[in-house]
């Protein structure tokens, strides 16, 4: 019965999303009101990751609470339904809960908040999560508060990738404490995030087993290069897959696609497997049209992986001026042509991959009606 129910739900999702599939791979005009925000609340970070060099560079100060308050007084943010708080390491901001309060007040349709953390300082993370949960308890529109914890290897491997001795054990402690909290708070959900890279491509199965033992879902994403968000495009030879490593990574992503029951992640994994072997991405995501990024200094970007061009700064212009301006539209067109085809990021894949699933499901249905309908290879 559960399998029948699951297939029925997927079929309904396919049918519904097929009506909006054409929006994904072309310019959307007029530009819609966004529903997804990634807010990098600080550039500061307490890890020393080999695949992210953000911690190596001096940055300007973070936005103050007062500046964030002024920014979100703009009612053009009222369409937002999903928020991700990231960094740097977002829990390093002592006023994180104040920022969350400002945003939830300004966004009455917000139903999911995600906190992306490295999990290094267990007690700090737990206290921040508790504070955030208290803040949203009175906000009935928020259905889920997701804590996404990074884990890239077992034991010393994770320590080496993240550049801090004992990092792995602290992450496990953080996950264990969060799991205890989740038993008491239904709106708290947990997720492990892992970046597949040359150093850990042979450790994916171990990570899956660890996550299974913890009872926490894990998602894998391919390593992404960004000149601004990760600042990892220079001197990154060790981060590039050698041909034999790329072949193994492609096999890993193919296996993940076969094993994962979630349609949205399944199609990302298949795309990632092809990209490891040199193909371009088959499906773009919704960033720049339905989602956007606010950086710690107020700069607005269409995507964290296309940060060499900014829409502008919210301390100087209103969101309406930035979002619907000619400058932003030119950047969107450039992003679709230059960045999206080679972007292997798992971030922001839910809407676009459901749309791809919808397209495939819809064509499968057509093939049943018309056997001459061309079979889709994916």
How should these model regions be labeled?
Residues 2, 6-7, 140-297, 301, ...:
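Radical SAM enzyme [4Fe-4S]-AdoMet core and its adjacent flexible, acidic
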Residues 3-145, 227, 354-356, 364, ...:
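Conserved alpha-helical substructure of the radical SAM core
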Residues 13-34, 266, 270-274, 310-327:
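Short, charged low-complexity linear segments at domain edges
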Residues 36-60, 67, 75-78, 82-86, ...:
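Soluble, non-transmembrane catalytic domains of enzymes that act on hydrophobic metabolites at membranes
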Residues 46, 50-53, 286, 341-344:
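Cys/His/Pro-rich metal-binding microdomains
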Residues 52-55, 128, 161-164, 306, ...:
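Residue-level signal for well-ordered alpha-helical positions
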Residues 89, 117-119, 151-153, 194-196, ...:
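Short, flexible loop/turn elements at secondary-structure junctions
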Residues 297-378:
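Flexible mid-to-C-terminal extensions adjoining Fe-S/redox cofactors in radical SAM and related proteins
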């Amino acid at each position: 019965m559960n399998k029948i129910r699951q297939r029925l739900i997927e079929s309904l999702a396919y049918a519904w999303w097929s009506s909006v599939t054409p929006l994904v791979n072309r310019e959307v005009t007029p530009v819609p009101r966004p529903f997804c925000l990634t807010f990098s609340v600080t550039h500061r970070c307490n890890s020393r990751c080999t695949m992210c060099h953000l911690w190596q560079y001096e940055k300007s100060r973070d936005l103050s609470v007062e500046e964030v308050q002024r920014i979100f007084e703009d009612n053009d943010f009222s369409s937002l339904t999903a928020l991700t708080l990231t960094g740097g390491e977002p829990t390093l901001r002592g006023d994180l809960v104040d920022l969350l309060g400002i945003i939830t007040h300004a966004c009455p349709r917000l139903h999911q908040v995600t906190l992306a953390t490295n999990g290094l300082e267990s007690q700090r993370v737990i206290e921040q999560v508790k504070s955030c949960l208290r803040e949203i308890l009175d906000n009935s529109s928020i259905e889920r508060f997701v804590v996404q914890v990074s884990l890239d290897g077992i034991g010393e491997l994770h320590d080496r990738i993240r550049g801090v001795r004992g990092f792995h054990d602290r992450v496990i402690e953080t996950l264990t404490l969060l799991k205890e909290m989740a038993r008491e708070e239904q709106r708290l959900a947990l997720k492990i995030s892992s970046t597949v890279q040359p150093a850990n491509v042979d450790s994916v199965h171990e990570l899956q087993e660890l996550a299974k033992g913890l009872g926490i879902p894990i998602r894998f994403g391919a390593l992404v290069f960004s000149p601004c968000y990760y600042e990892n495009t220079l001197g990154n030879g060790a981060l590039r897959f050698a041909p034999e490593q790329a072949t193994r990574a492609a096999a890993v992503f193919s296996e993940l696609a076969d094993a994962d029951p979630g349609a949205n992640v399944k199609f990302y994994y298949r795309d990632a497997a092809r990209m490891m072997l040199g193909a371009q991405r088959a499906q773009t995501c919704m960033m720049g049209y339905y989602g956007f990024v606010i950086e710690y200094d107020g700069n607005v970007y269409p995507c964290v992986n296309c940060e060499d061009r900014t829409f502008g700064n919210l301390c100087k212009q209103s969101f309406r001026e930035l979002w619907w301006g000619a400058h932003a539209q030119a950047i969107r067109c450039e992003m679709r042509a230059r960045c999206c085809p080679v972007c292997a990021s798992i971030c922001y894949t839910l809407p676009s991959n459901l749309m791809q699933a919808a397209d495939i499901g819809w064509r499968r249905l057509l093939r049943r009606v018309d056997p001459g309908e061309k079979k889709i290879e994916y």
